[in-house]
Amino acid sequence: MTLSRFPDDPAEIREIASRADVPDLSPRYPGSFALEAWQDVTYHLTNLATWPLFPRHERHTPQHPLADYARWCVRLAGASARRRRALREQDELLREQDPFFVFPLQVEGDYQIRSHSPFATMAEAVQHVIASFACTAPERARLVVKTHPLDNGVRNWRVDVGKSARDLGVGERVSVLDGGELGELLARAAGCVTVNSTAGFEAFLAGTPVNLLASAVFDVEGVVDRQPLETFWHEPCP
């Protein structure tokens, strides 16, 4: 379960909505990668500098921050080439007529994975989804695994996903998109599979059916498709 007190009863949500004003969805506090990076570095370096005062402090991240930053330096060096490749692959995908499902990944250390899902790691979730897709999805369907924008590259998803897909006989139908525009993908996708990522909200806005693999604050009847994943591949319901 999540720790949210937000109701999950559709009737109760509608009753609350009937008393609320029309929301202003215009961004008030726009963010940026530079701002988020500055906040992250400041937080972690302060923790490192004051470690002698708090020797029992435990990090919430699975990796040491300096190792994480080293991986980010490598990622940033190849960002332009990676973005061009992702957009090219996305354009090719959108030109095809076969239906496809999008699986947006979450970062490996995401507490929503570690504390609010049946998976110990994101890699376990990936293996679960590919196995289900290989066994039960329609033969013409494709699965697009979309990396998280803040993935540090410590795991090579293109290699890992490719190997799992080939081992399960769906190597030609499963692809990894390391970049691209999630909104454009969701607008064309037959469905979105997620553990409990906020990417589910983007899917709602695009009118794309969402299937959850774990608990989430938006796991509400009539909002997400609660069918088993094996059924969702065939009849995704918005």
Q: Model-predicted segments: where are they?
A:
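Catalytic-core helical/loop segments in enzymes performing group transfer/polymerization on anionic/lipid-linked
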Residues: 1-238
